[in-house]
Regions:
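Hydrophobic beta-strand segments of well-ordered beta-sheets in folded domains
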Residues: 1-4, 26, 167-171
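A conserved beta-strand-loop-helix scaffold within acyl/acetyltransferase catalytic domains
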Residues: 3-25, 31-142
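Aromatic (often tryptophan-rich) hydrophobic motifs at membrane interfaces
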Residues: 101-197
Length: 197
């Protein structure tokens, strides 16, 4: 099967392509800046999380086996079989091979992991691309908005890294579909391009 889709980042880079708002497939890119209201709200949620004993740990502190275990457990808790989870063995191999690209944090509460998103990062001379694959969280803490706290932390750290390196941030939450409308509060929804032939 040939994939004809192109990232918005490639607009103008190739001939034989089309980019139009009428194209069906769209991608969700985190907005360049967060509003003061949203920043204040996320900071309050984070402070509440910390006051309850919550911890933030760098994903790179964990072995590939530990990350795979954390991911499978939290993804399964979050989605309850509604979405296919990567196999443990495949995750370990992926984390081993792409260790140098891993980015982000793992949230802990009561000494147990409670939220984690797989994020891979790569850098070019002009921009840094972050690909947030998907993740999971422990639904017993739904009132704490762990998913929002984690995404806020990860995107804040990504913005800070890009500012230090004087590069443009491209942080993707993947393909956009209407049933993932929550992405609109975080993202600009941008049509993907495609090849003509």
């Amino acid at each position: 099967m040939t994939n004809k889709r192109l990232s918005p980042q490639h607009k103008g880079a190739f001939v034989n392509t089309i980019f139009s708002g009428r194209l069906k497939h769209k991608v969700a890119w985190i907005k360049e800046n967060i509003s003061k209201t949203s920043e204040k709200k996320r900071r309050k949620e984070f402070e509440k999380f910390c006051a309850m004993g919550g911890e933030v740990r760098d994903a790179n502190r964990f072995s590939s086996e530990e990350l795979a275990t954390i991911y499978v457990e939290l993804f399964t808790l979050r989605w309850q079989g509604k979405i296919y989870c990567f196999k443990y063995e495949d995750l370990v191999r992926t984390f081993d091979a792409l260790r140098h690209l891993i980015f982000g944090s793992v949230l802990f509460l009561n000494a147990r992991p409670c939220a984690f998103d797989i994020i891979f990062m790569c850098s070019s001379p002009e921009w840094i691309y972050f690909d947030d694959i998907n993740g999971g969280y422990d639904p017993q803490y739904t009132t704490l908005n762990l998913g929002s706290i984690l995404l806020w932390l990860n995107t804040s750290n990504a913005r800070a890294l890009c500012a230090r390196e004087k590069k443009t941030m491209r942080f993707s939450l993947g393909i956009y579909k209407e049933f993932w409308s929550y992405k609109k509060q975080w993202c600009d929804i941008i049509p993907l391009g495609r090849t003509i032939f």
